[in-house]
Amino acid sequence: MQLSKYKNQSVAVFGLGKTGLSVINVLIKSGAKAYAWDDSKEQMANAKTMYKECNFIHPKKYDWHEIKALILSPGVPISYPKPHWIVKLARSFDCKIKSDIELFLEAKAKNQKIVGVTGTNGKSTTTSLIGHILKSAGKKVAIGGNLGVPILDLEKDAEIYVIEISSFQLELINMPAVIPVHDHTFFSGSQYRAAWMIKRVSEMTKKMTEVTKRMAGMIKVDISVLLNITLDHIDRHGSMENYIAVKSKLIGGSKVAVIGCDNEITADIFNKFTGNKIPISGVRSLLDDKKGAEIQEISLKLENHNLSASDAKINLTSNAENIAASCAVCKLLKVDSSTIIDGIKSFSGLKHRNELLGKIENVLFVNDSKATNAESSKKAILSYKNIYWIVGGRSKEGGIESLSKHFARIRKALLIGESTEVFASTMENKVDYVRCCNLEDAFRLAFEEAIKSKEKTTILLSPACASFDQWRNFEERGEAFCRMFEKLRDSFTITRVV
């Protein structure tokens, strides 16, 4: 990837994780004069070792009148809870702040197609599934963005780029599109009520419609996918209005928008959006029988082609929305239905996302560590019965109150982490629960009870919480659960999960 417009130009990079390092690499190869900084001494030391040609000077010493742009890593806050000092500094000199995604969109060839995927839940799986199907169809595809490989590190000659884009990344693109809302108590924990939020959806999306008008044609992707929007990341975006506006930025400049309609907020966005659009649903048919993909608990039907749940490697129920979006995108890219079905059949899914680990006698073990909010856990809970549910961590806004209607599927809840007492209060007189010291304690207690049952049972790690109270990330939490399962199965006969 060549950033020719920045040749001989001074460009600053802040944040030296994977994204920042990829930006430095491309800038240097493109002949730009790169400046870089990070608050972390460790990250600075690593970057200095890798890129001798880069100027590692404190930003306060830059000649900001010479800096063409500041390329910011997505982890750096630009508004909430308060702007990072580098953001304030750049703005004081009217310096343009950009993301690596903007650099990529500026540099890509006109004939290269971009599929951008966002949403609160399901982004990574949908991005990966679309890419997998397109590769199965013989397309030259690159997959990345927020998922794994930074966008500027992707191969430069791909025919189609399938890019996962998080709200943190979208926030950096055309930042004036964010609606400032300074009332930080708008969705304060105990006062939050889902029903009240839904009443505000129409009001929010009226504002959002004006946002999409202003940003139309600015974020140029060929196909955008907006899966769903549920309460999340309010600590970063300041309010639900801001979060909705940021998530919706992707659809404004796309040639076609694929929008989920199982979610109240995105359904309202679909109704108000005036551009080219396709509705998708994982629970009902939105198009006529000849065009739509119908996903049931035991099978998937696409035109005259069928896939039974027993032949799929992923759970069709919990992945229904992801599959519907993938079908829509691949049909738009001229992939035939038979190839789409074969691609879904051969897709193994992603680790820590409703991942079937194996069976020990009557007990199925499922690692859904990526479920960091209630809506994500809901999909896993609806996929199984007689569940021993390991849940808890650092709770998100709204907790697990929205899952109360599904508690009948829970045999017992095993509570871990900071959220234990809050979740215990939610579950009181509704479901049997036990407080556990840690994940290992919960795993042991769950298996001791589950193995005694003559019925088929499921031990499900689906925390509905962030992992940061005990782990560095959801991957570390999930890997710990996987190791516990592997250690346990050594003394039992393994039945292959089908």
Curated annotation (Swiss-Prot):
<dbReference type="InterPro" id="IPR013221">
    <property type="entry name" value="Mur_ligase_cen"/>
</dbReference>
<dbReference type="GO" id="GO:0004326">
    <property type="term" value="F:tetrahydrofolylpolyglutamate synthase activity"/>
</dbReference>
<dbReference type="InterPro" id="IPR036615">
    <property type="entry name" value="Mur_ligase_C_dom_sf"/>
</dbReference>
<dbReference type="GO" id="GO:0051301">
    <property type="term" value="P:cell division"/>
</dbReference>
<dbReference type="InterPro" id="IPR005762">
    <property type="entry name" value="MurD"/>
</dbReference>
<dbReference type="GO" id="GO:0005524">
    <property type="term" value="F:ATP binding"/>
</dbReference>
<dbReference type="GO" id="GO:0009252">
    <property type="term" value="P:peptidoglycan biosynthetic process"/>
</dbReference>
<dbReference type="Pfam" id="PF21799">
    <property type="entry name" value="MurD-like_N"/>
</dbReference>
<dbReference type="GO" id="GO:0008764">
    <property type="term" value="F:UDP-N-acetylmuramoylalanine-D-glutamate ligase activity"/>
</dbReference>
<comment type="similarity">
    <text>Belongs to the MurCDEF family.</text>
</comment>
<dbReference type="InterPro" id="IPR036291">
    <property type="entry name" value="NAD(P)-bd_dom_sf"/>
</dbReference>
<keyword id="KW-0067">ATP-binding</keyword>
<keyword id="KW-0963">Cytoplasm</keyword>
<dbReference type="InterPro" id="IPR018109">
    <property type="entry name" value="Folylpolyglutamate_synth_CS"/>
</dbReference>
<keyword id="KW-0573">Peptidoglycan synthesis</keyword>
<dbReference type="InterPro" id="IPR036565">
    <property type="entry name" value="Mur-like_cat_sf"/>
</dbReference>
<keyword id="KW-0436">Ligase</keyword>
<protein>
    <recommendedName>
        <fullName>UDP-N-acetylmuramoylalanine--D-glutamate ligase</fullName>
        <ecNumber>6.3.2.9</ecNumber>
    </recommendedName>
</protein>
<dbReference type="GO" id="GO:0005737">
    <property type="term" value="C:cytoplasm"/>
</dbReference>
<keyword id="KW-0547">Nucleotide-binding</keyword>
<keyword id="KW-0961">Cell wall biogenesis/degradation</keyword>
<keyword id="KW-0133">Cell shape</keyword>
<keyword id="KW-0132">Cell division</keyword>
<dbReference type="GO" id="GO:0008360">
    <property type="term" value="P:regulation of cell shape"/>
</dbReference>
<feature type="binding site">
    <location>
        <begin position="119"/>
        <end position="125"/>
    </location>
    <ligand>
        <name>ATP</name>
    </ligand>
</feature>
<keyword id="KW-0131">Cell cycle</keyword>
<comment type="function">
    <text>Cell wall formation. Catalyzes the addition of glutamate to the nucleotide precursor UDP-N-acetylmuramoyl-L-alanine (UMA).</text>
</comment>
<dbReference type="GO" id="GO:0071555">
    <property type="term" value="P:cell wall organization"/>
</dbReference>
<comment type="pathway">
    <text>Cell wall biogenesis; peptidoglycan biosynthesis.</text>
</comment>
<dbReference type="Pfam" id="PF08245">
    <property type="entry name" value="Mur_ligase_M"/>
</dbReference>
